[in-house]
Amino acid sequence: MGKLNNYYLQSYGCNVYVETGTGHGGTLGKAYQHFKRCYSVDIDQELVINAMNAYPNAKVGLGYSNDVLEKWLSSGEFSQEDRILFFLDAHFPGADYRGAAYTVEGEYAVPLQKELELIKKYRPNGRDFIICDDARIYMLGPFECGNVPDLQVKGGLAFLKDLYPFQNISINFYEQGYIEIDNRMV
């Protein structure tokens, strides 16, 4: 689970923060200080309730990231003028906090591709910045926390080429690795 330790969230020129994977709320707490509106989703009811209590002005949803993200994106919750910083961290639901298996198999195990497809569908002209953690489950490389060759998503990051221009995508090898997609200058 990434924590965006090496990121200055306020430096991206965004006014809205959306994360998938609330966890203990550490990253939400960091964002809560800098954004007009914050959104977070998790499948763990206890973690959601704790985040709602800690950050009463944030909108915290309970459910699978794809479902809640689509609800927010399709509802008119965000205008095209909004600049959103997305932090996509909902893979391996239940594994970090409730002992579920770390696996890349199953519909909800690694929702990154679907999450990015939803963002592209509902915000085709959005001037957003997207950070996705755990790049090391999509590729091998000089990751600070090492590689996980036994836990690789089939096809890796090939799906990105159909969603975003190559020049907007970069890989950061800090910690478990981050995929960064910069659409602010689209």
State the predicted function of each range.
Residues 12-13, 34, 80-82, 126:
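Residue-level preference for short coil/turn positions at secondary-structure junctions
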Residues 77-88:
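Short SAM/SAH-binding signature in class I
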Residues 18-20, 41, 63, 86-90, ...:
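Active-site flanking residues adjacent to catalytic metal/cofactor-binding acidic residues
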Residues 10, 74-78, 124:
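Residue-level signal for alpha-helix termini/capping positions
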Residues 1-73:
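SAM cofactor-binding core of SAM-dependent methyltransferases
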Residues 32-34, 53-56, 75-76, 99-103, ...:
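Short, glycine/charged-enriched secondary-structure capping and boundary segments
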Residues 58-59, 84, 128:
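Short, conserved active-site loop motifs that form the nucleotide-linked donor/cofactor pocket
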Residues 92-186:
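C-terminal substrate-binding/active-site "lid" region of AdoMet-derived donor-dependent transferases
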